[in-house]
Amino acid sequence: MSNVSKKKLSLPTVQQPAARWAFVLAVCASLGVVVSYYWRVFYGLDARGVSAAGVTGLCVGLAVLAGAAALALRRVRDFAKKGAACILLCGVLFAFANPPMQTPDETDHYLRTYAISMGRFDFDAQRGYPEDVDELVAAFPGAWVNAHTSAGLGTDPDTHAEQPFNSAGYVLKQYGKDGRVESIRDSFEQYLTWLYRDSVPQRVTEPVSFLILPFLPGALGMALARLFGLGALGCLYGGRLVNLLAYTALCYAALRSAHKCRPAFLCIMLMPMSLYMGASLSYDATLLGCYYLMLALLTRDEWNDKTALFYALACVFANGTKPYINLLWVVLPLILRKSEWKVRFSRAVYAVLTAAGALALTLGVEQYGTLLRHNYGAIARQGGTTVNGGAQLLFVLKNPLRYIAVLLGTLYENDGFLGQLGLFGWKDMPIAFISITAPPVLLAAAMLCTAQTDTLGRRRMGWLGAFGLVYAVGAMTAMYITYTPVGMVRIVGLQTRYFLPVWLLLVLAAAAVLRRVLAPRLTAAKGEALAVTLCGWYAFAGAVLLFQHYFVGPVYTIYK
């Protein structure tokens, strides 16, 4: 072969990476233009005075960065590192797409985290915060959508007939066809202009929250933000980002520890609801990470001292963060066979030691919160005087069949909670697309775990399934006893985030069934590669939709 022909053959291989990058980035930029045009036309951004260049630049820039990240991750061969990178990058989008205080209970979590970042490790109900914190809390009430919902009777401009209106579930609303659009942007303007206003916000004091340990990552982020001269809003985002780092680190440890069904773990970690909590100031960020780590360790064929130590630490931390219900995790290592147990202690001794550590931390946290609490007085029970844990427990024991009906009715009313994976905010901001597509994505993840090398065995899978059922019923019963009025026919306060580890176990069970029904030829490596693509882009789409619903549209039009 001549030298000329050799050069011709070598040119495509040299130019291929550059050509791929150019092509992918061009496609991403084009998609960004399409999305920006869709937003401008369908949601009337031009008529609302939003800069067309700004919207287009935002969409194109975000799309190009997403494409560049996807191309860069193609070079990463390690599944755990690639998955952790997806979690971190998509989590950053969620941290900024989610407005302040809109994660459940984030106002209390923000105030407690801010206090810790100032070096306050005790609790004082009369102690306040800097003025910009007061302004931030005043501008962004929790459950913002519910707080700004309008309902009543209006007049149809075409038929002149009265028609009811209710803006529940809509962040943006407009009075009249050409009226001004009210949105959460108004809250940002209210906070950012507080120095130029004469009004004084209501003074904020420390909340009824007596935890320290799970808020330490967020407190570190807030302390770093203040070092850079940022105010209350900057501290919120700084705390979210460091909390996200903690969630990412735990997920990375889980992906490295999991020996089987890794696509299922990546899928649940990248679920929009998981990232929504992981990129917030909620202690659920580290709590979910601990759940995923413990379940990942249970996919290993054998346990050694190191495995047992990591599981015990995660279990003890989970109990210190959310006590009593998480004691169920203590018994899970007992499902391992004796031949699979290579730990210096027996399984029974290990379970007792882990339970002792969990209870010790739980009681220590409770005593710490009691002894270092000042000026709180008598703390009212959530739910009011109609809530009585002892009476409710007695009612359940006396009426077991009725309580089963309460469980089933609550599940039915809430779409089994599996259909609420797109319900954000304080359960006041639904995104229908995510609610509809999340279950099929979980099913797709189950199909990606059907390689024969991913099987967990009937015994282990059976016990994990039983644990998932007991955990779900236990979580519902705990909310019924502690938050629900005695004898009520439905359970108050349940949210789909409580069931995320149950959905992971459901995916593992579905994979076991599909493995037998479909007789697939998919390899574990191929399944993992497909999982990164599917779940990564789904998480990216979830962040974009969250931003869209809070800042772009849909817009609810009210005619009066």
Predicted regions and their residues:
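Short acidic/glycine- and proline-prone juxtamembrane loop motifs at membrane-interface regions
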Residues: 280-287
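Transmembrane-helix motifs of polytopic, lipid-linked glycan transferases
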Residues: 67, 237-261
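Membrane-lumen/periplasm interface segments of multi-pass, membrane-embedded glycan/lipid transferases
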Residues: 363-451
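Transmembrane helical bundles and short interhelical boundary loops of multi-pass, membrane-embedded
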Residues: 34-57, 357-363, 368-379, 523-560
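Perimembrane helix-loop-helix junctions
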Residues: 297-303, 326-357
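Interfacial juxtamembrane loops and adjacent helix segments
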Residues: 120-236
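Transmembrane-helix signature of polytopic, membrane-embedded enzymes
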Residues: 20-21, 81, 230-233, 252-272
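Membrane-interface alpha helices of multi-pass inner-membrane proteins
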Residues: 276, 307-323, 328-334
